[in-house]
Amino acid sequence: MPKRLGFFTRLLDQGSAQTRYRLAAEQIRHAERLGFDSAWIAQHHFHEQEGGLPSPLVFLAHVAAQTDRIRLGTAIITLPMENPLRVAEDAAVLDLLTDGRLEVGFGSGGTPTSFLPFGLTSEQRGAAFADHLHLIHSAWRGDTLSHPDNRLYPPAPQLAERIWIATFSAEGAIRAGQAGHGLMLSRTQPRPPGEPRLPLDAIQNPIIDAYLSALPDGVAPRILASR
C-alpha cells in the first residue's frame, strides 16, 4: 500500500475568522510547495474554539484557485447537519473547479449542542448520517431525485470513489469497508475507560483490521490517519 503525506488543519490559529482563513490558505500553499500530497480541513459549526469553519467546500474553492497539484479534502463534513443534495451539488462543482483534486471526508460526530439548531439531537446523528450518505450516493450515481426530470447537475459519479468515512469504532470501519470507502482515523480517538495512556496503535490497529477484512475483493484499501 503506497504511503502519502498530507497536511491537516482545524484552523485553530489565534485571531479573527478572516485571519484564520487567510493563514490556513497560506499553510496549504506552503504544503503544496513542500511536496505534500494532500491538504485536509475540518468543519465546525458555531464554536470558535473548535476552529470556526462552517463552510469547508467554500473555503476549498478559494484554495483551489491558489494551488495546482495538491489534493484538497474535507476532514470532515459533519453530514447529519447538512442538506445532502446541496453537499452533493457543491462537491460536484468544486471537483470540476479543482480538475479532480477533491477528496470528500464525512463523519457523524460533533459538539452535541451543535446538532440542536439543525433540528437534531446527538442521539439521532447516526440515522441521519446513513440517510444523507445514501442520498449523496444516489445523486452522484445519476439516479432520479423524486421526479424523472430531476438528476444531479453537474454529474459526479467519480466522487463516489473518493469518499472517506471517519470513525472511532470497528463497526464503523466495517461499514466503510463494505461500501469500498476510505477509512479516516484521528489522533483524537477516545481511550477506553481506565486506560487514558493507551497508545493509538493499540486502539486503531483492530479498527484497521476490521476495515481491511470488510473490503470487497478487488477494492484497494484507503486509510488516512491524523497524528
Where are these regions (language model features)?
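Internal, glycine-rich beta/alpha segment that forms the wall or movable "lid"
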Residues: 1-3, 83-189, 195-198, 202-209
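Electropositive, surface-exposed helix/loop patches at the edges of structured domains
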Residues: 76-86, 141, 217-227
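Acidic-and-aromatic substrate-binding clefts and catalytic sites of carbohydrate-active enzymes
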Residues: 47-55, 80-85, 190-192
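Active-site beta-loop-alpha junctions enriched in small/polar residues
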Residues: 10-12, 44, 77-79, 107-111, ...
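N-terminal beta1-alpha1-beta2 module of alpha/beta enzyme domains
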Residues: 1-66, 70-71, 161
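Acidic (Asp/Glu)-rich catalytic clusters
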Residues: 32-33, 60-69, 91-102, 177-180, ...
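Glycine-rich, Lys/Arg-enriched anion-binding loops that position phosphate/diphosphate groups
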Residues: 189, 203-226
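Hydrophobic faces of well-ordered beta-strands that scaffold small-molecule active sites
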Residues: 5-9, 39-41, 72-74, 102-106, ...
